[in-house]
Amino acid sequence: MSNKDLVSIIMPSYNCGRYIEASIRSVQAQTYKEWELIVVDDCNTDGSYEMVQAMQRDDQRIRVLRQERRQGAATARNWALREARGRWIAFLDSDDKWEPEKLERQIAFMEEHGYAFSYTAYQEMDEHLQPTGKLVTGPRRITTVGMYAFCWPGCLTVMYAASKVGLVQIKPIHKNNDYALWLKVIQKADCYLLDECLARYTRGRSGSITTHGYGALIKWHYFLFRHAEERSAPVSFLLMFGNLIFGVLKKLMYIKKL
């Protein structure tokens, strides 16, 4: 396996035993075969650690790391990123899935245009893995200003070129840590949309950010800008408020019915 062609896939895992096997199977079903999947177990208690270990024994492209104590997805992703060996970095949460051609289509898109940072459209599934009938896309190009305005990319769709972006590490915040990553990566490269539905996002699982109300979202966005990004209180408030406005815009412009 050549690092020149390798995709390192980052997957934090905490008590997703109901979904994680299907998530990993969607990686194994990729038409692009040069990948490593780095699963970071965040002290699972539902048997999913043993499940992934069994899958690792059958497929050496799967690597399992286990945190000594529960530290959250940000710390898990940071560790996986330090361990990653690939030219490309991709992300998949342990309750989401990819379409078989996801990696192949996205790499071809980035190589054809010389892009270092990209994302794709995806469809939403409910917690029972049934389609909600919603397709989520986004702006064709996201600049630094655009990324601060709103977290447009779905985590399960993002890919960037490690050789151009370098090692990315974020502060150990408990929510919006994927957004914190994109705010780091966008400093190195604009983000471009491959407007094809290449992933399936599981919405509404207990504990996921989509199950909380607007009050919690406001608090977490302020915390992201104030503490992870170390912005002043007034700037953090303005960025938080802007995110609320652009969140409405996303619903109007970029969430479509299938």
How does the language model describe each region?
Residues R82, K134-A216, W220-H221:
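Conserved nucleotide-sugar donor-binding catalytic segment
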Residues R18-E21, D46-A54, K97, E101:
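Acidic helix N-cap motif at the loop->helix transition within catalytic regions
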Residues I89:
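Short aromatic/hydrophobic "clamp" motif used to bind/position activated sugar donors
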Residues E101-T132:
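Conserved donor NDP-sugar-binding/catalytic core segment of glycosyltransferases
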